[in-house]
Amino acid sequence: LEFRRVLFRSRSPKVAELEAAPSVALVFWCKRLSWQLRIQATATVQRSGPEVDAVWTRISQSPAAGDYLSAKAPGDVWEEDASDAPSDNTQHFLGIVTLQIQNMDWLELARTGHRRAVFTADQWEWRVP
């Protein structure tokens, strides 16, 4: 299973963290359904290439382009007198993270009894909650 197109600023310190340790976990909660979904995945970082170029071509014409043109990296100390003027429109810092999903663990909490199942690419099975 593959989950694509998580966009990021390639100057973010988080990118180096993903490259050093690509195992990730995502946790989602839906209050209305009382469902929790945990996803274990492996991240691959793309800083350049045809896919990044294609996404940038679309984003570069939108207000979101400024998010990927900043002269500063996310988390840098903000200095009142320093400029955060965007770089020219050709030097962007857009990247894509692709997540290869290893498994998904679904849990439903209910007064009538909890349910849990684990899904992989080729099977699923009920588990004790």
Model segments located where?
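Acidic-histidine catalytic/liganding microenvironments
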Residues: 21
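Short, small-residue-biased leader/transition segments that mark boundaries at the very start
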Residues: 1-7
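Mg2+/Mn2+-dependent nuclease catalytic core
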Residues: 9-12
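Short Lys/Arg-rich amphipathic alpha-helical segments
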Residues: 15, 31-35
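Charged, gly/pro-rich active-site loop segments
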Residues: 35-129
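Short conserved beta-strand and strand-loop elements enriched in small hydrophobics
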Residues: 24-29
